[in-house]
């Protein structure tokens, strides 16, 4: 009966598709015939703070346990970020794209990431829900924009987990004094998919299992592992500078400035894990105090650490000799510290283990909130009554991640992951500006038109700057004299002609609209620095998302919004 307590494990059709549109072939056919009108409705439909914070949480049936403090969030920041970039992508991008200037790539991507961190922090304090960027965009930019973001969040979660798990295998092999690919199974499949990785599958399964047991225990385990990893990082930095050879920094820009920005766009993945902290808001004891400390504190320290580690690697070994699969271990071996490579490999394993562990927590919470809106089946929104964790959501991310990690190489995954991350981070400052300058039923239409016009100036000029850079017209600056002034005009237009409609209650981004507009520009610029194949893969994935949306997601969310849901029995 409706309202009767049910067990967590349930597999009926109505648990996956309780919406009226899916109860029979006739009702589904009728829903498809209304696709255009339903899309128009959802395109302009926006949620609100109260709905996201209170009403949607009822879909989970049980609440998550508030057990985290700012201390936990800082270590979650370390655990989710350090490991993925430094131990996975630094060697690859230094060797192939930037050379010793990889340190500048980390500076560029770090500054851009900090701008995004500001935006995330304001939203997380104002709207402390598990959905993170998905919930924020659903409130400010509407249902369709939130869906595209949801698709990219799932893509980022699945591909990111697979990429780190593949790298885990490489470092484990190095720790055993074998080549990075020694533990993989060679096949006759096409390049990039011909090295099967069963160890990566086991690592993903273990991380998902631990994250499903208890958030508090996962936090404790992450704290211990991250502390060990931090000690290894200090060893790497100090030992790296002790064995530094400044001649390895020459030439500093072997691939030119273009290489720096291409590498920056890829190593941006190194900062992508910080958004996991925002998804912990429902489990944080004091979100308004703890989230700013956790986000801003951890990311500031991490940016400095990344730059120092990248510099130490470049000074230890010539960029042409850097091993793209296990850079630090091989670098220490090259300077005579053969024992050092084992310590570095162990630290890298610790770092990537925490990335997988914290990632499993954050990704499951994203999925939980997306499922609460019925964009994906609501069974994935359920929170287990005993563990207080979303086990079904963990499984939804872990299973496809394991399949991808089993087949796909790191180089195939990295660029696809970066463009997905950059897309989400570009949407966030746009949403923040909408939140500050537009309030439904209060903001005059003329001010809304001014805001949209100014935002178009900022976005289009940023795209123009990125495109002109991508044309590789070395020594020619005439294009920037057109695109950059338009960015300033758009930002100044917001300053002088669009009055702010909302002031943050607790913590807000400083220098609005300048910092959000700068975040838009840097993210779009970095996105444009990626290769053409990254956009092709991104386009294919986006088309797949849209196909799902128009066949399933649109009708499920329409029914949810209009309460056309069959009662659970």
From Swiss-Prot:
Main location: membrane
Location of this chain's protein in the cell: Cell membrane
Tissue expression pattern: Expressed in roots, stems, flowers, seeds, and leaves. Mostly present in leaf rims and cotyledons of developing seedlings.
Membrane-related topology note: Multi-pass membrane protein
Transmembrane regions: 68-88, 98-118, 144-164, 193-213, 223-243, 252-272, 291-311, 342-362, 390-410, 412-432, 451-471, 478-498, 506-526, 538-558
Top-level lineage group: Eukaryota
Keywords from the named record: Amino-acid transport, Cell membrane, Membrane, Transmembrane, Transmembrane helix, Transport
Keyword Zinc on entry: no
Record-given protein name: Cationic amino acid transporter 5
Naturally occurring in which organism (per UniProt): Arabidopsis thaliana
């Amino acid at each position: 009966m409706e309202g009767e307590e049910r067990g967590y494990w349930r597999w009926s059709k109505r648990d996956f598709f309780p919406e009226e549109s899916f109860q029979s072939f006739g009702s589904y056919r009728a829903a498809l015939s209304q696709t255009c009108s339903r899309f128009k409705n959802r395109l302009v439909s926006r949620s609100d703070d109260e709905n996201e914070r209170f009403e949607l949480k009822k879909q989970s049936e049980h609440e998550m346990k508030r057990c985290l403090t700012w201390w936990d969030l800082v270590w979650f920041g370390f655990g989710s970020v350090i490991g993925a970039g430094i131990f996975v992508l630094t060697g690859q991008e230094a060797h192939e794209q930037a050379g010793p200037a990889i340190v500048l790539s980390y500076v560029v991507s770090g500054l851009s990431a900090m701008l995004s961190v500001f935006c995330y922090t304001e939203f997380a304090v104002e709207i402390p829900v598990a959905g993170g960027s998905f919930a924020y965009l659903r409130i400010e930019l509407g249902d369709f924009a939130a869906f595209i973001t949801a698709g990219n969040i799932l893509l980022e979660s699945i591909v990111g987990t697979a990429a780190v798990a593949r790298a885990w295998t490489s470092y484990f092999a190095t720790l055993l004094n074998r080549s990075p690919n020694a533990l993989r199974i060679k096949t006759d499949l096409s390049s990039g998919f011909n090295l099967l990785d069963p160890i990566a599958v086991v690592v993903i399964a273990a991380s998902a299992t631990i994250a499903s047991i208890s958030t508090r225990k996962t936090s404790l385990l992450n704290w211990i592992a991250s502390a060990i990893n931090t000690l290894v990082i200090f060893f790497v930095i100090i030992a790296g500078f002790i064995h530094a050879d400044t001649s390895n920094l020459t030439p500093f820009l072997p691939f030119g400035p273009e290489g720096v920005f291409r590498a920056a766009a890829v190593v941006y993945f190194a900062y992508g894990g910080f958004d996991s902290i925002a998804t912990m808001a429902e489990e944080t004891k004091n979100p308004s105090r703890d989230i700013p400390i956790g986000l801003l504190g951890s990311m500031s320290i991490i940016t400095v650490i990344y730059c120092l580690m990248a510099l130490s690697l470049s000074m230890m070994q010539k960029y042409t000799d850097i091993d793209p699969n296990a850079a630090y271990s091989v670098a220490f071996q090259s300077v005579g510290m053969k024992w050092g490579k084992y310590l570095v490999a162990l630290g890298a394993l610790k770092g990537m283990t925490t990335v997988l562990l914290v990632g499993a927590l954050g990704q499951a919470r994203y999925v939980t909130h997306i499922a609460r809106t019925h964009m994906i089946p609501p069974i994935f929104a359920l929170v287990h009554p005993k563990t207080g964790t979303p086990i079904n959501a963990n499984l939804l991310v872990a299973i496809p991640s394991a399949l991808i990690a089993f087949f796909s190489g790191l180089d195939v995954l990295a660029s696809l992951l970066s463009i997905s991350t950059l897309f989400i981070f570009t949407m966030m400052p746009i949403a923040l500006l909408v939140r500050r300058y537009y309030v439904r039923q209060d903001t005059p239409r003329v001010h809304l038109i001014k805001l949209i016009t100014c935002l178009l100036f900022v976005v289009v000029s940023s795209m123009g700057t990125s495109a002109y850079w991508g044309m590789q017209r070395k020594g020619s600056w005439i294009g920037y004299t057109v695109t950059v002034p338009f960015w300033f005009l758009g930002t100044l237009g917001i300053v002088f002609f669009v009055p702010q409609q909302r002031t943050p209650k607790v913590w807000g981004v400083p220098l609005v609209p300048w910092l959000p507009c700068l975040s838009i520009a840097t993210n779009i610029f970095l996105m444009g620095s990626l290769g053409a194949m990254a956009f092709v893969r991104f386009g294919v994935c986006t088309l797949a998302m849209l196909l799902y949306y128009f066949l399933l997601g649109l009708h499920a969310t329409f029914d949810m919004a209009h309460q056309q849901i069959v009662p659970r029995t």
